[in-house]
Design a protein with these regions (language model features):
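N-terminal leader/signal peptides at the extreme start of proteins
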Residues: 1-14
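Residues within membrane-spanning alpha-helices of integral membrane proteins
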Residues: 24-25, 52
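Juxtamembrane membrane-water interface segments immediately C-terminal to a transmembrane helix
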Residues: 43, 47-54
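N-terminal signal-anchor/signal peptide hydrophobic helix marking the start
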Residues: 14-24
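N-terminal export/targeting and maturation segments
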Residues: 8-9, 50, 61, 66
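C-terminal juxtamembrane segment of a hydrophobic transmembrane alpha-helix
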Residues: 26-45, 64
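Short, surface-exposed interaction loops/tails
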Residues: 111-152
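Extracellular/periplasmic head regions of type IV pilus-like filament subunits
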Residues: 58-123
Length: 152
């Protein structure tokens, strides 16, 4: 009978510390994955914004080819829905909308010979976009503020 008590019993299973370490590692990995996923989503929305602005620019160029002027502004750098509705359906199927909570903006000179399209990005503005420290047709385009603008 003493032999039964004196032998070490081999325990099956994991200790509490081992379980806590594994749970902590899983938590850290999950956090890293979620942060990476959020960054990827932001970049995807920005790519969509850049594409939408380029599509608007193409539609404006087709409009210019037909009329010899770009769509003239009604007010200072309004949302595209204010005065670019004339592009639908002849030059594009529908006006694009920002995938987030912002909007796209359009400003033009009084004669319709120049314009600026503006979108607000979530990440840094790509190289080659138009930037100015002052308002261009009412649209302020500052790269530090993540404002992406293009002109013809």
């Amino acid at each position: 009978m003493l032999e039964i008590f004196s032998k070490k019993r081999r325990q099956k299973g994991f200790t509490l510390i081992e379980l806590l370490v594994v749970i902590a590692i899983i938590g850290i990995l999950a956090t890293i994955v979620l942060v990476s996923l959020n960054t990827a989503r932001q970049k995807a929305r920005d790519v969509r914004r850049l594409s939408d602005i380029r599509q608007l620019a193409l539609a404006l160029e087709m409009y210019y080819d037909d009329t010899n002027y770009y769509v003239k502004n009604i007010s200072t750098c309004p949302s595209i829905s204010t005065n670019l509705g004339v592009l639908v359906p002849t030059y594009m199927g529908a006006l694009p909308s920002d995938p987030g909570s912002n909007d796209y903006y359009y400003g033009s000179d009084a004669n319709g010979q120049d314009y600026v399209l503006r979108a607000i990005l979530e990440n840094a503005v790509p190289a080659g976009s138009y930037t100015s420290g002052t308002a261009t047709y009412g649209c302020v385009c500052v790269a530090a503020s993540k404002e992406y603008c293009i002109r013809p």
